[in-house]
Amino acid sequence: HGDSFEVCKSCVDNGFSSVMIDGSHLPYEENVALTKKVVEYAHQFDVTVEGELGVLAGIEDDVVAEKSTYTKPEEVEDFVKKTGVDSLAISIGTSHGAFKFKLKDGEEAPPLRFDILEEIEKRIPGFPIVLHGASSVVQDYVTLINQYGGKMEGAVGVSEEQLRRAAKSAVCKINI
């Protein structure tokens, strides 16, 4: 998971068979340009590239986002065509980080936006889709951790039901 050409190039040069370039924090055209540059370099060495459209809230590998921005289905076809990526990470309501969603009593985690996923699948049928930040948080473990002094009150993740539904779609990889 890299946020620069240099990081991805270093991974390719050091023998990685795939890289993930996260330009989602950039304006659309800059994301396209950065992702395309990584793809052009990586493909010379038969290295696959995952790109990302839409911003996931949270922190991952020093990429910080305060709030999530859903992937715009109308951008995916253009992005895939212009960049040549091999797979595409999208934002449909997941989040990076250890705690996912912090809920108050009586609240439920927001559902994933399967309407966005379905629209993306229509626009790029059969194309490999990736969900980042899609881990689940087993409530029995949260209770046990809190019982022994941990502080994970209200921590939940993506429900197993939603993960199963995503896995039945074009989602080929779910990162936790």
Predicted segments with their positions:
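Short catalytic/ligand-gating loop segments at beta-alpha or beta-beta junctions
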Residues: L131-S136
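Alpha/beta enzyme core
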Residues: G2-P128, Q139-V156, E160-S169
